[in-house]
Regions:
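Phosphate/nucleotide-binding beta-alpha loop and adjacent structural elements of enzyme active sites
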Residues: 1-20, 28-272
């Protein structure tokens, strides 16, 4: 069995789960010779790579490592991705989160369509409509290809408190609205997008723009009280300012917080 990743989380796994004996501990970039008594190797040092079972401890770049292993002929069933396990639970694992057959889902920060795809699976395809807001042109194209389903609309704009144009840093999963950056994008408020129509579930993971986007969803939230799943870890003040804002719109909300990584990143506030 191979532990892939000799960084912080690889160290935690070998230290706390010391009853597991690893045949290899590997890393693409070795910063030391040993990790808690294990020699840190490279993949080239493993003789029969395809016969091994790989546990990938890396949380943020697990997709690149998954591709690396698959390109080497490692079957998917031999790869356990800890980062993927944590990520797939986001937005849908809260036991109090219930879905009907006529959900209207707003996915602000759609990335490559993975969350919208998961929404379709969770609802067994029984929903009213899906709106994906993704200003990154490449990722918006991926969304259209991955979520080619009925009543699914990909809006190539960023969620904000108004319709305007803003500087944008194109960086795949961490694309961010900035004061100065390499691209200019169009933005839209959720209230304007829906134009008085209802939403039943709003998810936001937009790299620090959540507060502004919630300002632009005030009328929708006040009128329809949709379920919310909002990232509250991008800015230091988000963890208290975002709950205050949501409760100012509707004090009947009950708030729940879940963290989907070992680092405190991927902390989501649910409002139901």
């Amino acid at each position: 069995m191979v532990l892939f990743g000799a960084g912080t989380w690889g160290g935690a796994i070998t230290y706390f789960l010391n009853d597991i004996v690893w045949d290899y501990v590997v890393d693409n970039r070795r910063h030391a010779e040993f990790l808690n008594g294990y020699k840190i190797s490279s993949l080239d040092e493993i003789e029969d790579k395809r016969a091994c079972y790989y546990v990938v401890s890396v949380l943020f770049k697990w997709r690149q490592i998954e591709k690396q292993l698959k390109d080497m002929g490692i079957p998917s069933e031999n790869i356990l991705l800890l980062g993927k396990i944590a990520e797939e639970k986001q937005y849908f694992d809260l036991p109090y989160l219930k879905f009907g057959k006529d959900e209207v889902f707003i996915d602000a920060g759609g990335y490559n369509g993975d969350t919208a795809k998961r929404f379709i699976e969770v609802t067994n395809g029984m929903y009213d409509s899906i709106y994906i807001l993704e200003p990154n042109k490449i990722l918006a194209t991926e969304c259209r290809e991955k979520v080619n389903e009925r009543n699914c609309y990909v809006v190539e704009k960023g969620a904000w408190n108004e319709s305007t144009k803003l500087a944008f840093d194109m960086a795949d999963a961490s694309s961010t609205i900035l004061v100065s950056a390499d691209e200019v994008i169009e933005t839209i408020s959720i209230d304007e997008l829906l134009d008085g129509k209802r939403a039943t579930y709003i998810k936001m993971d937009i790299e620090g723009a959540e507060y502004k986007a919630l300002l632009g969803a005030e009328q929708t939230i006040r009128k329809y009280k949709p379920k919310l799943a909002i990232s509250v870890y991008h800015n230091r003040c988000d963890i208290w300012e975002i709950p205050k804002l949501v409760l100012s719109y509707n004090s009947d909300y009950k708030l729940y917080f879940r963290t989907y990584s070992f680092t405190g990143n991927d902390t989501i506030m649910y409002a139901i």
